[in-house]
Amino acid sequence: GSPMTKDLGITLSSGTTVAKDCLDDLDRGSFPTSTGSLRSFWVAHIDGNRTVIGGGLDCIDVGDRIANSDVVSIKRLVGNSLESKDLVTTRFYLATTTQSAYLFKKGEAIPGTMINPQLWEYQHFIYYLSPNSKNGNPELRKRYLTPGGGSLLIGGAMAEGIEQMRILLGVDDSLVPDGEIDRYVATNNVTGQEWSEG
């Protein structure tokens, strides 16, 4: 499909704003913008001073970061299409037809021009390592997008004792991409073009 760019095939409701959104290095948050396509997958590196290389991710306090580790951001649609009765107030959704897409939260009306749209849950998850507040041991944590507060921390650790998280990304260097990985690179060596192809 086409990249998700605001006003180029996808429209956002007035409710698709969040107070505490997690922005990437290009100041793009959870939702598509008109300044570039949505990154469905992005990884940032936290250096030895617990600073995000390239900027972004201010939603994670410096004291809640583990040095020399990566942060993973994933934006996606979930599972099977839903019925309107199945929507919940703590999530965002994407209504789609063959002609258009509309991002909204429960309680907002879908445009009448969208005949029989399919409804999908839209998610933005952020995974990172953080020191445990009681003993300082590193643990894997997860933040998720909500209509009420933006990027919220899920209570408790997903896994404990993970000292570092480093992601290597496979890059297809073929002139005409063939889907085969030609090399693996660290997150801070991925080019803007490679992120947009990912």
What are these regions (language model features)?
Residues 1-198:
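N-terminal pilin/flagellin-like segments and related low-complexity appendage regions
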